[in-house]
């Protein structure tokens, strides 16, 4: 519950476990009623894959992780409006807007820019949606397989299922033998 003391709301745009797409516009409209409150949106699972259902000008901060769009692991972006005052987590020089002392890693910055450009050019949404629909159709016909990802308002890039009678690791390794790669959990 928000009140006049709330200074930050942070929300995932796309849930990394079941793929739910959060109604960011609704959150924006709620946060607007609290002038001290800023809105951070975690774009990691949806950036470049799904068309935003909100305007970037209406959010105060956002984060992107490059490895989720085929970029370098350990490289990310924190975007924020000019009126946002962030405090540094390390003491040092005033480089990087005074947030992080030291020289910016130019190689990572260039790779991030290139990764974003390529990711935005190579949108596979329709193809991935067709694969998701195909999998849902086939899996729904198999007894004791439960689809946990919602059909509507969900990313087609994530399809979470449960098979209670089998060990997840065993299924994962059996599928690997068929060159089908799945995850049995989240490292996030």
Please state what every model-predicted region is.
Residues 1-188:
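Pyridoxal 5′-phosphate
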């Amino acid at each position: 519950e928000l009140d006049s003391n709330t200074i930050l709301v942070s929300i995932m745009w796309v849930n990394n476990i079941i793929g739910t797409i959060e109604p960011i516009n609704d959150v924006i409209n709620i946060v607007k009623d609290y002038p001290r409150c800023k809105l951070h949106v975690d774009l990691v699972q949806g950036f470049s894959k799904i068309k935003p259902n909100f305007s970037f000008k209406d959010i105060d901060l956002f984060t992107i992780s490059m490895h989720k769009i085929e970029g370098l692991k350990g490289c990310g972006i924190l975007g924020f409006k000019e009126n946002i005052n962030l405090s540094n987590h390390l003491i040092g020089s005033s480089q990087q807007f005074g947030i992080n002392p030291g020289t910016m890693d130019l190689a990572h910055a260039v790779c991030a820019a290139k990764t974003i450009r390529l990711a935005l050019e190579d949108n596979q949404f329709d193809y991935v949606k067709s694969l998701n629909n195909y999998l849902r159709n086939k899996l729904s016909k198999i007894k004791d397989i439960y689809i946990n990802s919602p059909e509507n308002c969900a990313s087609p890039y994530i399809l979470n299922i449960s098979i209670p009678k089998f060990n997840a690791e065993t299924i994962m390794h059996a599928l690997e033998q068929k060159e089908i790669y799945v995850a049995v959990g989240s490292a996030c």
